[in-house]
């Protein structure tokens, strides 16, 4: 009966419209064939592809010539990793290697900029000018013994004052602050900040920084946190906006304009006349820096074949860490914060040459069907790599010639909302990134909170290099884990380690402390005797180190994972979302410092709960190791979720694979060809009387 009603509604089928073009990731039946193979493994067969039924024309025959222009482009051109990249020589082509190296060099400058807050905005020890070093007068904010500038120490029994908790709210950077007591009440402490001028003991190798330049102490301490806040907010907005623009106009223009404007705003920061101007310009500097980070990351991914993507991305991370390790020496060389800021920004001048050296992403041109520009770039690359036309075994160039009349087809990141699987994958990775970078600050603050009891952590350089060394060890471990477990397995392992470290630090140590104070049994008495405060502090530091180690890997791997599973047409937009989520995680540090560490414990508990949710959600992600990058939204939808452990021989999987899925997209065309069906025919066979 349903077939009869369709037949009546459709009439003779002459007025039926062809299937709609691709929208929000859905393809017409005839276009699905062009997208299915790209989700498979590189170099493998098409055993896991969805095999769609051929599309039927309303008259029962093939599509007419008037519909040919709206059909999908050639499958050969969409298979970039399998056809186009091998034709250009892959990563073995000399010009491609040069381009990859050119994406590594700016990572050093980016590392300088990302960690500059630790030096420009470090809050030094200070005392009233004219009070004498180590002398406590009216308004003196810090008491202690002064040797030389690098050896300032404070007696551990010194009570906190309004100024002292204001000046020590950040010992090295926004993520390694010691625990601070609640602000003391008014009264005698009101006289501690009656000074109008101070002398400073800056620990970062500089003679003057932003805090000492404009006396951002006592009642003005909050302006330091706003300055840190402004850079991160600029990064967040930059990731979101430049990501969408890069998907629409291309990676190359965004990279060029971001470089030009970071030179303008970055150098103007060094000429700031007050802290308000400094914070405002830092926002725009962060905005432009985000455009550079995002476009270079996408270009690096799109240049590489499947087997080289991860290692090339990790090399860029190591170069950025080199900038982190070199920053203290650079600060000691400059001695003044304005010179340091100018020296950090000036190397970006070299990136102006990229306009004439670095071409547009060929993968993006092919994915957005800009075949005219793609043809010119392919000819240019073959000339640079000395590739002869005879090596085009698969016939890429002849197919490209046939498609030159196509109009470009660009996509915005909002299209992902209508997809079935892709938006879920991106949301999961955004939450992972937010959790990883957010809880990293909790572990760092917990570790630096024991600096009074661990003399090594009292030194600024010890704090700084401890954090940098943990990040370096995390990246090294990530290389090994991802090699053996893949992207999804590695992310799951590091998230489990993060959750364990967080829960043990929050629960186990508090439980031990409770039992040690009220021993009700012989076992508890032994715990009370054996578990001293120093031992608990050592456990807490150990858990903090493990937590920072694992959470750094979670954040970095989430960003890389998103770059692989997001289709080329919206890759920068997807990267912008996950990087902005990471920025929100890092933003919690200056926000909590701005409120004098209030709500820190709740902050840690919330992120600890998020780690448990993320462990479950990671299992929903596909595995992208050794797979071709998806080129359009339909390719991203074809990424399958495979089990973590391979099936044993003879064991049947419980879930259907892509090869076993059936395509019912042509059923609605049965009514259109109903005139050719015998009487009594149904969708499932012949109707018996």
Curated annotation (Swiss-Prot):
Recorded hits in PANTHER family, A to Z, give:
SOLUTE CARRIER FAMILY 22 MEMBER
Q: Which residues cross the membrane?
A: 229-249, 253-273, 283-303, 310-330, 339-359, 466-486, 489-509, 541-561, 572-592, 601-621
Output the Pfam families linked to this UniProt entry: Sugar_tr (PF00083)
Question: Which InterPro entries does this chain map to?
Answer: MFS_sugar_transport-like (IPR005828), MFS_trans_sf (IPR036259), Sugar_transporter_CS (IPR005829)
Source organism per entry reads Mus musculus (Mouse)
**Mostly located where?**
membrane
The name on file for this protein is Solute carrier family 22 member 23
Name the Gene3D superfamilies for this protein. MFS general substrate transporter like domains
């Amino acid at each position: 009966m349903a077939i009869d009603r369709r037949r009546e509604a459709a009439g003779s089928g002459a007025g039926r419209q062809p299937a709609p073009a691709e929208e929000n990731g859905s393809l017409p039946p005839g276009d699905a064939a062009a997208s299915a193979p790209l989700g498979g493994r590189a170099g493998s067969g098409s055993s896991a592809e969805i095999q769609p039924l051929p599309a039927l024309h309303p008259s029962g025959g093939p599509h007419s010539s008037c519909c040919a222009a709206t059909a999908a482009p050639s499958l050969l051109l969409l298979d970039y990793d399998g056809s186009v990249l091998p034709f250009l020589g892959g990563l073995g082509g000399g010009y491609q290697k040069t381009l990859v190296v050119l994406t590594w060099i700016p990572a050093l400058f980016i590392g300088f900029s990302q960690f500059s807050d630790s030096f420009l905005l470090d809050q030094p020890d200070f005392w009233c000018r004219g009070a004498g070093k180590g002398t406590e007068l009216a308004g003196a904010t810090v008491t202690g013994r002064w040797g030389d500038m690098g050896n300032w120490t404070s007696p551990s029994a010194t009570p906190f004052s309004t100024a002292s908790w204001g000046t020590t709210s950040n010992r090295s950077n926004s993520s390694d602050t010691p625990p601070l007591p609640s602000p003391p009440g008014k009264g005698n402490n009101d006289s501690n900040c009656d000074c109008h001028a101070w002398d400073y003991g800056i620990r970062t190798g500089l003679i003057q920084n932003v805090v000492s330049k404009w006396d951002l102490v006592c009642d003005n301490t909050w302006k330091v946190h706003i300055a840190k806040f402004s850079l991160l907010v600029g990064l967040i907005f930059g990731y979101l906006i430049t990501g969408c623009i890069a998907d629409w106009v291309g990676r190359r223009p965004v990279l060029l304009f971001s470089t030009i404007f970071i030179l303008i705003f970055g150098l103007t920061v060094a000429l700031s006349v007050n802290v308000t101007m400094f914070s405002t310009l830092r926002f725009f500097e962060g905005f432009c820096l985000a455009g550079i980070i995002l476009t270079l990351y996408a270009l690096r991914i799109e240049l590489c074949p499947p087997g080289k993507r991860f290692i090339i991305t990790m090399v860029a991370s190591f170069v950025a860490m080199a900038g982190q390790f070199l920053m203290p020496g650079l600060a000691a060389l400059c001695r003044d914060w304005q010179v340091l800021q100018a020296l950090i920004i000036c190397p970006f001048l070299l990136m102006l040459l990229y306009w004439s050296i670095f071409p547009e992403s060929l993968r993006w041109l092919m994915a957005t069907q800009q075949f005219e520009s793609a043809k010119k770039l392919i000819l240019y690359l073959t000339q640079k790599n000395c590739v002869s036309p005879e090596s085009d075994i698969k016939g890429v160039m002849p197919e490209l010639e046939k498609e030159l009349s196509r109009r470009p087809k660009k996509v915005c990141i909002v299209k992902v909302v209508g997809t079935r699987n892709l938006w879920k994958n991106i949301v999961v990775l955004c939450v992972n990134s937010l959790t990883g970078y957010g809880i990293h600050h909790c572990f760092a603050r917990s570790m630096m909170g024991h600096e009074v009891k661990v003399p090594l952590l009292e030194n600024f350089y010890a704090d700084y290099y401890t954090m940098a060394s943990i990040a370096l060890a995390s990246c090294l471990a990530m290389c090994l884990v991802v090699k053996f477990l893949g992207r999804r397995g590695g992310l799951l392992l590091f998230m489990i380690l993060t959750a364990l470290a967080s829960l043990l630090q929050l629960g186990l140590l508090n439980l031990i402390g409770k039992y040690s104070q009220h021993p009700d049994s012989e076992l508890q008495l032994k715990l009370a005797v054996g578990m001293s405060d120093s031992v608990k502090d050592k456990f807490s530091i150990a858990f903090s180190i493990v937590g920072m180690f694992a959470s750094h890997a979670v954040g970095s791997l989430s960003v890389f994972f998103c770059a692989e599973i997001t289709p080329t047409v919206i890759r920068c937009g997807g990267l912008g979302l996950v990087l902005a989520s990471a920025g929100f995680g890092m933003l919690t540090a200056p926000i909590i410092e701005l409120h004098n560490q209030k709500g820190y414990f709740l902050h840690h508990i919330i992120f600890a709960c998020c780690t448990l949710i993320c462990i479950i959600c990671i299992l929903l992600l596909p595995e992208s190791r050794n797979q071709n990058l998806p080129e359009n939204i339909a390719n991203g939808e074809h990424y399958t979720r495979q089990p973590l452990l391979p099936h044993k021989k003879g064991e049947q999987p419980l879930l259907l694979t892509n090869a076993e899925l059936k395509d019912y997209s042509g059923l609605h065309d049965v009514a259109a060809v109903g005139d050719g069906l015998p009487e009594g025919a149904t969708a499932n066979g012949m109707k018996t009387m």
